[in-house]
């Protein structure tokens, strides 16, 4: 057998620390999942809007989008 499970290690309760006591309330909702989709759709909408924003910024940076009346060169800024 390549691996062996040590039952003594699995049954020990672990070490109690002050950091663990502080972080315990954050883990109190473990395993509780709200039914339904929740805010998943809203998250998807914001992800799509952010992706569109990144594409627009990338196209402006690459100068593949030429805006009418707005020069894209650094020389025009001086």
Swiss-Prot record:
Transmembrane region(s): 41-61
Molecular function GO terms recorded: phosphate ion binding
Subcellular location: Plastid, Chloroplast thylakoid membrane
Key words of the record: Chloroplast, Membrane, Phosphoprotein, Photosynthesis, Photosystem II, Plastid, Thylakoid, Transmembrane, Transmembrane helix
Its membrane topology: Single-pass membrane protein
Known role: One of the components of the core complex of photosystem II (PSII), required for its stability and/or assembly. PSII is a light-driven water:plastoquinone oxidoreductase that uses light energy to abstract electrons from H(2)O, generating O(2) and a proton gradient subsequently used for ATP formation. It consists of a core antenna complex that captures photons, and an electron transfer chain that converts photonic excitation into a charge separation.
Subunit structure: PSII is composed of 1 copy each of membrane proteins PsbA, PsbB, PsbC, PsbD, PsbE, PsbF, PsbH, PsbI, PsbJ, PsbK, PsbL, PsbM, PsbT, PsbX, PsbY, PsbZ, Psb30/Ycf12, at least 3 peripheral proteins of the oxygen-evolving complex and a large number of cofactors. It forms dimeric complexes.
Name assigned to this protein: Photosystem II reaction center protein H
Native source species: Spirogyra maxima (Green alga)
Lineage, opening ranks: Eukaryota, Viridiplantae, Streptophyta, Zygnematophyceae, Zygnematophycidae
């Amino acid at each position: 057998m390549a691996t062996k499970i040590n039952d003594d290690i699995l049954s020990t309760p672990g070490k109690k620390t002050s950091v663990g006591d502080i972080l315990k309330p954050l883990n109190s909702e473990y395993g509780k999942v709200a039914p339904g989709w929740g805010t998943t759709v809203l998250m998807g909408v914001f992800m799509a809007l952010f992706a569109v924003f990144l594409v627009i910024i990338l196209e402006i940076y690459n100068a593949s989008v030429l805006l009418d009346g707005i020069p894209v060169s650094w020389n025009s800024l001086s």
